[in-house]
């Protein structure tokens, strides 16, 4: 189906372009969301008569998005999740979770504006792109951690890949696996028992 784009669509075209797309994509997304019109003579005339108004509205939305992007770009958000000792999350951080965290700070974004290829499944610092407008993208940093203290330490640049780094110096020395499974100590004990 041929459609006339009413706004810039990534990987498809600019406003006013006549493009051929699959029927389902046109009916279920472009036409339903008001992002395109069917490309027939009546709609082409209608688009040309409203082109100046559409371009002005698009420019206004773009300037609003740029104002929000200036406030949002480079901000850091903390996401607290439970995770294994290896840093793998029990679950994941999805686009919806990211949108909720950013919205809790007072920014209005939807989950469809968060651009991640796949859910985030490990703790650490992650950069995420947020498309506020087809031509305006802001980048935020997610600090994914097990606790607020751990998030603070990650933000300072500490690596949290060992038990000492995660739990600090207060680790019980007798709880170390080497103390339980020292094969040399077992051999010495057996030799001492045999000699007695």
Swiss-Prot record:
Region (Disordered): 172-196
Keyword Metal-binding in annotation: no
Classification via InterPro entries: Ribosomal_bL9, Ribosomal_bL9/RNase_H1_N, Ribosomal_bL9_bac/chp, Ribosomal_bL9_C, Ribosomal_bL9_C_sf, Ribosomal_bL9_N, Ribosomal_bL9_N_sf
GO process terms (BP): translation
A GO cellular component annotation in the UniProt record: ribosome
GO function terms (MF aspect): rRNA binding; structural constituent of ribosome
Keyword line: Ribonucleoprotein, Ribosomal protein, RNA-binding, rRNA-binding
A Pfam family recorded for this sequence: Ribosomal_L9_N
UniProt entry tagged with the keyword Ribosomal protein: yes
Superkingdom of the organism of origin: Bacteria
Bias-annotated ranges (Acidic residues): 181-196
Function in brief: Binds to the 23S rRNA.
PANTHER family the record matches: 50S RIBOSOMAL PROTEIN L9
Protein family according to the UniProt entry: Belongs to the bacterial ribosomal protein bL9 family.
Protein name: Large ribosomal subunit protein bL9
Organism annotation: Chelativorans sp. (strain BNC1)
Organism lineage string: Bacteria, Pseudomonadati, Pseudomonadota, Alphaproteobacteria, Hyphomicrobiales
Gene giving rise to this polypeptide: rplI
